[in-house]
């Protein structure tokens, strides 16, 4: 019962937020899965590669500080990462934990596809510092 109420209330909030939305193609750059939740709740297409992943605050800040180089750098697979999901490594050793993917090739394909839609002139950045893999 409580779960059903939560779903109904969340959808009511989502409808209200969608009705106020004027920017239909924001590039949300988040250090965890929050951006994906926001895109889903607002019914928007993903305009960012930062979906279904987690980055430590240190790695996220390094990526932001070196944005133009990082976003165009090659992402290589980290073999034997110790995690049960793929991990990639970009510029300056920045690690990307693709926590909702099974295979690195799939996560890399989505990363590249969404990088093509990224709009640096229409970007919002959010760092979450709630601990390891919060909200993922």
Give names to the regions the model predicted.
Residues 2-136:
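Extracellular glycan-modifying ectodomains
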């Amino acid at each position: 019962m409580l779960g059903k109420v939560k779903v109904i209330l969340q959808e009511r909030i989502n409808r209200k937020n969608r009705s106020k939305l004027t920017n239909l193609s924001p590039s949300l750059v988040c250090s965890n899965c929050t951006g994906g939740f926001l895109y889903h709740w607002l019914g928007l297409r993903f305009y960012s590669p930062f979906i279904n992943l987690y980055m430590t605050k240190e790695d996220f800040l390094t990526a932001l500080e070196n944005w133009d180089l990082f976003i165009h750098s090659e992402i290589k697979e980290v073999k034997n990462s110790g995690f049960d999901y793929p991990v990639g490594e970009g510029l300056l050793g920045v690690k990307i934990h693709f926590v909702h993917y099974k295979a690195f090739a799939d996560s890399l394909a989505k990363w590249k596809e969404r990088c093509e839609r990224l709009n640096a002139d229409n970007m919002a950045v959010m760092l979450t510092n709630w601990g390891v893999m919060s909200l993922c």
